[in-house]
Regions:
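OB-fold and OB-like single-stranded nucleic-acid-recognition modules
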Residues: 19-121
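Sec-dependent bacterial lipoprotein signal peptides
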Residues: 1-23
C-alpha cells in the first residue's frame, strides 16, 4: 500500500511540475517595458484590464482580428490578436510573444505583444 501511495504522490508531483513548466511566467508590464530586450520574442504572460480595443469582425467569414490595450496597474501594453477583441473593462490574462514595433492597420504601436492565448477572468 505504501508503494502505491508513493507512486501516486510522485506522479502528481511530476504532473504539477510539467504543467507549471509549460506555462509562461507572468510579468508586470512595467518590468517588460524596463527591459524589453530580455523579453523580445519570448513567450510571456500578462494580466490586467482591457482599456481600449479596436477590431474587425466580418460575419459569415473568417476575417477577424484587432488590437487591444491591457493595463495591469504598472503600465499598459497593446496586444495584437487574430481573434475577436475583448470589450473595454474586461479582466483578462494573455499569453503571447513580446514584439517591438507592433503594427496594426498601418499604425505602429511600439512595444507590444502578439497574442497566442487568452483567458477571461
Amino acid at each position: 500500500m505504501k508503494k502505491m501511495t508513493k507512486a501516486i504522490t510522485l506522479g502528481l508531483v511530476l504532473m504539477v511540475g510539467l504543467l507549471t513548466a509549460a506555462c509562461p511566467q507572468r510579468e508586470s508590464i512595467a518590468g517588460i517595458e524596463a527591459n524589453p530586450s530580455k523579453f523580445y520574442n519570448k513567450e510571456v504572460g500578462i494580466a490586467g484590464t482591457v482599456r481600449d480595443s479596436y477590431g474587425l469582425n466580418i460575419p459569415l467569414t473568417q476575417i477577424r482580428g484587432g488590437i487591444y490595450k491591457v493595463d495591469d496597474g504598472t503600465g499598459s501594453m497593446w496586444v495584437v490578436t487574430q481573434n475577436s477583441v475583448p470589450s473595454k473593462g474586461t479582466k483578462i490574462g494573455v499569453k503571447g510573444r513580446v514584439q517591438n514595433g507592433v503594427n496594426y492597420n498601418g499604425k505602429n504601436y511600439g512595444l507590444g505583444m502578439v497574442e497566442e492565448d487568452r483567458k477571461i477572468r
